[in-house]
Amino acid sequence: MRLTKQTAYALRILTHLAGTGARERPVPVAEIAGALHVTEPNAMKTARALIDGGFVVSTRGRSGGVRLAREPEDISIGAVVRSLEPTRVEADCVGFEVDCALRSRTPLNRLLDDAMEKFCATLDPYSIADLVDRRPEVRAVESA
């Protein structure tokens, strides 16, 4: 299984915010983009998805930015993946036209939906706090 880049960026952004203690103060998206070596438009798009998902809140203005909406321990990795990944995993029908009306109801696609849900359920017990490595040498590499 491969996560979309946006989901990977989202997990990195949330981990960055958790590691910097950004529950109290907003962090500008440009600062996050620079720290994570992500383009600002990608960071902005991902931040918008995280806002829509209720994982971060935004503050406008000169000292604005984004901050965690909840404690890192309360943000499930499974919930983040469910929120940002496409809602359905679909495989094309074999031997049929690409836009087959039955595609979403085929046995293969029902199995893929079940697999995606089990994948997310496996991630549910883990939180963003579990991704934060507080060792100084790791933090130094992350910020380089």
Regions found by a protein language model. Give the residues of each.
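N-terminal helix-turn-helix DNA-binding core of bacterial DNA-binding proteins
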Residues: 3-38, 57, 67
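Alpha-helical residues within the helix-turn-helix
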Residues: 34, 51-52
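Key DNA-contact positions within bacterial/archaeal DNA-binding proteins
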Residues: 41
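Short, hydrophobic-biased segments on the C-terminal half of alpha helices
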Residues: 47-48
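Beta-hairpin "wing" of winged helix-turn-helix
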Residues: 53-69
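Charged, amphipathic alpha-helical coiled-coil/dimerization segments
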Residues: 65-85, 89, 96
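C-terminal regulatory/oligomerization modules of transcriptional regulators
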Residues: 76-77, 96-144
